[in-house]
Amino acid sequence: MVAYRLLALISLGLGSHCASALQYGYNQLSTHKDSAVVAGAFPAINGTHLQSPAFTSPGTVPRGFSDGTSGPTRDETMEGFMRRLARSNSWMAYHEADFKSEEGRKFPYMYLSASNSSVENPSSHKLRVWLQGGVHGNEPAGDQSMLALLGDLAANQKWAAKLLEKMDILVLPRYNPDGVFYFQRYLATNFDPNRDHVKLARQQTRDIKELFTRFSPHIATDMHEFTAGRTFGPKKDIIYAADALFSAAKNLNIDEGIRQLSEKLFAKRMGKDIEAAGLRWDPYITQGESSSSKLLLLEAGTDAKIGRNAMGLSQCVVFLCETRGIGIADQHFERRTLSGLVMAKSILQTAVDNFDEVYNTIERGIRRFTNSRNDIVLTDKSPIMERTFGMLNITDASLFDYPIDFATTTPAEAVLTRSRPRAYLIPPSWPDIVKRLEVFGVKADKLPYSYVGPVEALNVTSVTFDKEYYEGVVTTTVQTKLVERNIRLPAGSYLVKTNQKNAALAFVALEVRTKDLLPVLIMDVY
């Protein structure tokens, strides 16, 4: 079997981002708060004392939060809160990233460690944990739960010390400060920050990805909110009952041991912890299209352009954590923030309580993946099963289990696989591809000599274009035929070996049959 693959690409010149019905800034959704009947199913939880600015300093909350035109915590309020915590706690270090948002806003983050470690020089034999919120700017419980976690750690010094015996933690509470300013989902340029993890179209995505890559976490979480009022059923009179939806990374190119650790240890514990807090949960889902009258819900998918899977492809445990909040402004905000806090704390506590199992499983998984000769997975499918999903009737607030068809990705089933190449060859005319790979943490060796020899290549036999722009490109579906040929490439070409930790990110970026790829034309040899 020939082990090298040639990447010779032709640009399609697809033009710039086009997004319908969006303006520059303030792309805000309409607000539809819960009725009094529905709100009764989401009461305040007794004994809740959240240690974040929206709750400890309610006078700082902008008026617009009550009508869904603003979040609860301005940048300067958040930064002041973080700085005060860092001044009062030697194990908390306040940092500002050496890059800015698209509109020039800062990225403050906290580094928590009981030693003198840093992002570039982390503690040895400890877990590295990355926690982020505020990816979508109109999901305020995401970043607020991260601030509440910082406040909770400062208020519970013994618990913090117990955690930091076993881990270093980086908290980036606000991934998308421009989106938070405009209270909109998107970046300032109207790209979705959670759909840019393979294309890396925006510099902001690349900058944050490089920080993530330098830290190289064992565990990561991504805090979001989901739409509260979406209705289902023949009468459109039922909604999700859950306070929290969550999902591990699902891409099949993540080491199986790491995926099983996520599902069998972390996910099970998280569900129990949510229930113990008096809250409700279900797996993260989206609605699918079905030819039957039965509701089809799709479990979180495997797509690498989503942050959860992109982070997981660096061979780490990752969870998307969503709380019920989009579209209801400030309603139930304490309960929403608590839901996010409970999930984040559950992940940290599970890791510490099972430190040896977690650390050793992830480290073994990294080594196993790096040295693997198993096939790589390019496409997959989600088997459909029957199950129930927690719903709430909006007419009387009754809670019940609703029968659905469920497209599961725990696990997904591989459809198209390919033998794992020893390396990829990239001509010197494509340095931008190499720069993208380097952002992923993938090393590319520049060859001082010309390459002459056999390669395995893909001949593109058909290309079907989608009918509209998506995130700045026209997406395509391609068919290919595997060919072997001899090639000659000049000195200065790049060799990307696949026996490295982050090679799965090269697979999803370079293999022509995966999603969200590089441009090709029919009859290209790739």
Swiss-Prot record:
Q: What would you give as a GO molecular function for this chain, any one? A: metallocarboxypeptidase activity
SUPFAM superfamilies linked: Zn-dependent exopeptidases (SSF53187)
Q: Which cofactor does it need?
A: Zn(2+)
Its Gene Ontology cellular component terms are: extracellular region
Record EC number: 3.4.17.-
Location of the protein in the cell: Secreted
Q: Which Gene3D superfamilies match?
A: Zn peptidases (3.40.630.10)
Q: Which GO terms describe its biological process?
A: proteolysis
- If you read the UniProt record, what top EC class would you report for this enzyme, in one word? hydrolase
Pfam entry (one): Peptidase_M14
- What family does this belong to? Belongs to the peptidase M14 family.
Q: What does this protein do?
A: Extracellular metalloprotease that contributes to pathogenicity.
**Mind telling me what this protein is named?**
Probable carboxypeptidase 2
**Organism annotation:** Arthroderma benhamiae (strain ATCC MYA-4681 / CBS 112371) (Trichophyton mentagrophytes)
Gene name in the database record? MCPB
